[in-house]
Amino acid sequence: GDALMIISNSGRNAVPVEMALIAKARRIPVIVLTSLAHSRSVPSRHSSGKHLFDVADVVIDNCGVPGDAVLEADGSAVQICPTSTVAGAAIINMIEAEVVERLCAMGVEPPVFVSANIDGGDEFDQQWKGVLCRR
């Protein structure tokens, strides 16, 4: 079945928490990609006082630091260079690879779009547009 994946590094803001609560009320499993260290270091901004990880069925920790920045620049009082972008992209790509492998093992053609920048890419992708739009 379907699931909802919500990505929020801090996990504290009202909208992602509300999205998770609505999904749960509809019996849709919620998968969260967040920084547990960051979430646990700040108060929630949702009226329930809950963080995103509190309402998730599955929590994937991106292992980010509070504030999501890891480098200091000479002459700057703030840290720079967030890790959540790179970590999140890598985690999502690993999940995609695992899902595709499992679908193929079950004999199911995964609905994967190929790059429109390769010859035949647009034509290949047409097969999925009608299928995915109906969902």
Feature-to-residue mapping (PLM):
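Active-site phosphate/pyrophosphate-binding segments
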Residues: 101-135
